[in-house]
Amino acid sequence: MPDPDSTLAARLLRIRGRVQGVSYRASAQREAQRLGLSGWVRNRHDGSVEALVCGPADTVERFIAWAHVGPPAASVSAIEVGDAAPTDGAGFDCLPTC
């Protein structure tokens, strides 16, 4: 049986609430880098933030827990989480708004 700590996961998050204009993307990038995750984060035109987070399953879950709170100025009202295909690269990027 595989060690659950070594199981890789990729999750696509859509974060809603007051999450733009409050440094949510920059904070998410710092948190993902601190945790050693790969992926990206970007603003959406509908006012939400979207993130693709890849790494060990337990660490991805820790990022998701952080995302429910976000930086101090944010007010997260909801997060949708879905499975995703992992990214090909390393690092965690802030992408342009889409």
Curated annotation (Swiss-Prot):
EC numbers for this chain: 3.6.1.7
InterPro entries reported in the protein's UniProt record: Acylphosphatase, Acylphosphatase-like_dom, Acylphosphatase-like_dom_sf, Acylphosphatase_CS
Pfam families, A to Z: Acylphosphatase
Annotated catalysed reactions: an acyl phosphate + H2O = a carboxylate + phosphate + H(+)
PROSITE patterns: ACYLPHOSPHATASE_2, ACYLPHOSPHATASE_3
Record's keyword terms, sorted: Hydrolase
Transmembrane annotation, as ranges: none
Active site residues of this protein: R25, N43
Gene3D superfamilies attached to this UniProt entry: 3.30.70.100
All residue ranges annotated as the Acylphosphatase-like domain in the record: 10-96
SUPFAM superfamilies hit by this protein: Acylphosphatase/BLUF domain-like (SSF54975)
GO molecular function, one term: acylphosphatase activity
Family: Belongs to the acylphosphatase family.
Name of the protein this chain belongs to: Acylphosphatase
UniProt source species: Azoarcus sp. (strain BH72)
